[in-house]
Amino acid sequence: MSSPLKVIFAGTPDFAASALQALLDANYQIVAVYTQPDRPAGRGNKLLPGPVKQLALKHTIPVEQPLNFKNEEDRQQLRDYEADVMVVAAYGIILPQAVLDAPKRGCLNIHASLLPRWRGAAPIQRAIIAGDQESGITIMQMEAGLDTGPMLLKTVTPISADDTGRTLHDRLAQMGGEAIVKALALLQEDKLQAERQQDDLATYAHKLQKEEARIDWSEPASLIQRKIAAFNPWPVCFTEDNGQTIRIWAASASADMSKAKPGTILERSAEAVKVACGEGVLSITSLQLPGGKPISCKDLINGGKPLMQLGQVLEITS
């Protein structure tokens, strides 16, 4: 019987914490956790540990937080753990070849897409915006390129019409934990089979930018709706009404035709605020006024604020 794998885990946000929890539940020996340095957060701008660090401390696992691995001292510290494998999930720090080569069996990455589609930083949101019918988890052997390594295991989930960036993220986070537990079991039995990625099929999920969330009403309603879903909970789509920023949390799209200028409010009811788009009509069902919380259209009408009024033309550009 083979000896238990000594695992280093590297990750930072909630997505990674789900994978670490799955490994702990499966009784894997986590010899160290690597995570990004604590960041200022909250009203007091105090340094707060991320979800992965909090979980590691709860289980008394050694935590390392190098800024990067340019320092030989940091690279040697990692080697000193003598890990069999390093599991990486949304770590947020580029790993040089010296780190990738340090564990006996290299580094395995939990990536939230079906590679080679959506390599890069924001695969969940890009899949929703593109109208993909499915997403999933790829466990891959890491190499120097951006998400270019051999694929070791894949699991698939459909993307439903109701999915948002949050719901798909949470589902993939759970799937990622299940997939890495399975992958490590296969690794220990020498049963993992590597499949090279087809580079000509690769697409890139560029990092999200806040300005992307500004709604361009000249776009098709269906595309705007997918962006609203993808950018929930961040950065949240927004538009402007008389210079005031209105955040849009939920909406549906229809192919209804309108001759009105894109951005024109066509209907304002307790059910929805309907807006003309470049193609079709967007029905907004949840929005957020300046300084407030997300509300329904019924709350908008009852609130009596002179915003999102019938006939108003919402701004397309800044």
Curated annotation (Swiss-Prot):
Keyword field: Protein biosynthesis, Transferase
UniProt binding sites for (6S)-5,6,7,8-tetrahydrofolate: S113, L114, L115, P116
Record CDD domains: FMT_core_Met-tRNA-FMT_N, Met_tRNA_FMT_C
One Gene Ontology molecular-function label: methionyl-tRNA formyltransferase activity
Keyword Transferase: yes
GO cellular component: cytosol
Enzyme Commission code(s) on record: 2.1.2.9
Function recorded in the entry: Attaches a formyl group to the free amino group of methionyl-tRNA(fMet). The formyl group appears to play a dual role in the initiator identity of N-formylmethionyl-tRNA by promoting its recognition by IF2 and preventing the misappropriation of this tRNA by the elongation apparatus.
Entry protein name: Methionyl-tRNA formyltransferase
Short name of any one Pfam family annotated for the protein: Formyl_trans_N
Family to which the UniProt record says this protein belongs: Belongs to the Fmt family.
NCBIfam families registered for this protein in UniProt: fmt
Catalysed transformations (reactions): L-methionyl-tRNA(fMet) + (6R)-10-formyltetrahydrofolate = N-formyl-L-methionyl-tRNA(fMet) + (6S)-5,6,7,8-tetrahydrofolate + H(+)
Alphabetical list of InterPro entries matching this protein: Fmt, Formyl_trans_C, Formyl_trans_C_sf, Formyl_transf_N, Formyl_transf_N_sf, Formyl_transferase-like_C_sf, GART_AS, Met-tRNA-FMT_C
